[in-house]
Amino acid sequence: MPKVGMREIRRAQLIDATLRSIDEAGLPGTTLASVAQRANISTGIVSHYFGDKDGLLEATMRHVLRDLWSATTRRRVAARKDPRSRLRAVVAANFDDTQVSAPVMKTWLAFWSQSMHDPMLKRLQHVNTRRLHSNLCAEFAKALPLAKAREAASGLAALIDGLWLRGALAGGPIDTRAALKLAHDYIDLLLASD
């Protein structure tokens, strides 16, 4: 008889091992066997929980996305209620510690690449893109006409993605302070122009 709560403990252990495997070997080098080895369990257990490598990547990305959405919610709740503060909170969530570690950044890059070929991953990417745009647009719409708010949200989302991508590809720790400053300056520019 399985222990109560063991399923979630095991899944978390395997997701952590997947993040480490992608960090060390890339997505092509990440297999059910490499994940099992890092987690010190049998390949059969990995298959039992996730089915195959695609299922493992999907579960890992759902975990990373939950961390992002949790950081976004936490930071928005803690922010002052004005649009500038709440926009800055959304930006900060995208550069949260849960999103800028080497294993997570490499997993994001692998996910984006793979999402062009896998319908389930593509759907997850679309959900994430829509959620970011919706959060940004809702805040910009409090200070700008709706058409301008949509445009501003698209621009800020592109800036967030671009700053994050440049940071991820820089080969060292991401300079979150510099990224946040650029994004904050952009927000200030847009809100001042109204």
From Swiss-Prot:
Record bears the keyword DNA-binding: yes
Listed GO biological process terms: glycine betaine biosynthetic process from choline; negative regulation of DNA-templated transcription
Keywords linked to the UniProt accession: DNA-binding, Repressor, Transcription, Transcription regulation
InterPro entries found in the cross-reference section: BetI_C (IPR039538), DNA-bd_HTH_TetR-type_CS (IPR023772), Homeodomain-like_sf (IPR009057), HTH-type_TetR-like_transc_reg (IPR050109), HTH_TetR (IPR001647), Tet_transcr_reg_TetR-rel_C_sf (IPR036271), Tscrpt_rep_BetI (IPR017757)
Pathway membership, UniProt: Amine and polyamine biosynthesis; betaine biosynthesis via choline pathway [regulation]
Gene3D superfamilies assigned: Tetracycline Repressor, domain 2
Keyword match DNA-binding: yes
DNA-binding region ranges: 31-50
SUPFAM superfamilies for the chain: Homeodomain-like (SSF46689), Tetracyclin repressor-like, C-terminal domain (SSF48498)
Signal peptide span: none
Pfam families, alphabetized: TetR_C_6, TetR_N
Ranges of residues in domain HTH tetR-type: 8-68
GO molecular function, one term: DNA-binding transcription factor activity
Its biological purpose: Repressor involved in the biosynthesis of the osmoprotectant glycine betaine. It represses transcription of the choline transporter BetT and the genes of BetAB involved in the synthesis of glycine betaine.
Protein's recorded name: HTH-type transcriptional regulator BetI
Organism: Burkholderia cenocepacia (strain HI2424)
